[in-house]
């Protein structure tokens, strides 16, 4: 394999997102990585959709906002979000004293971190294999 060909195979390094609430995001990320199977879908588009929908619904639940349950997909994501929100409230009591704006920022930072760890920063080449 030529040097040019080898360089083309190497995945471009993506930097992890930085957020003001990194320490708290680390705690929530660690919980997901150890307890949530939904992070392990085999394709990047599945992971993108699940990260977005589950974490959006988790944020809505934590903020006491209405949650869209109009489709079967919405209800499926909602089930995971209910479990995650309940566990976050129990295991990380500091989340209960945060404002809606702080929770929104925290959950966006968490989504960015999960996208990085499970998609953009992942070395798993199967995520982008068109034949998989």
From Swiss-Prot:
Keywords: ATP-binding, Iron, Iron-sulfur, Metal-binding, Nitrogen fixation, Nucleotide-binding, Oxidoreductase. It is an enzyme of class 1 (oxidoreductase). One of its GO terms (biological process) is nitrogen fixation. Transmembrane segments: none annotated. The keyword Oxidoreductase applies. InterPro entries: Nase_Fe-Fe_dsu, V/Nase_d_su. GO terms for molecular function: ATP binding; iron ion binding; iron-sulfur cluster binding; nitrogenase activity. Pfam families: AnfG_VnfG. Its EC number is 1.18.6.1. It comes from the Bacteria. Its cofactor is iron-sulfur cluster. It catalyses: N2 + 8 reduced [2Fe-2S]-[ferredoxin] + 16 ATP + 16 H2O = H2 + 8 oxidized [2Fe-2S]-[ferredoxin] + 2 NH4(+) + 16 ADP + 16 phosphate + 6 H(+). The key enzymatic reactions in nitrogen fixation are catalyzed by the nitrogenase complex, which has 2 components: the iron protein (component 2) and a component 1 which is either a molybdenum-iron protein, a vanadium-iron, or an iron-iron protein. Hexamer of two alpha, two beta, and two delta chains. This is Nitrogenase iron-iron protein delta chain. The lineage of its organism: Bacteria, Pseudomonadati, Pseudomonadota, Gammaproteobacteria, Pseudomonadales.
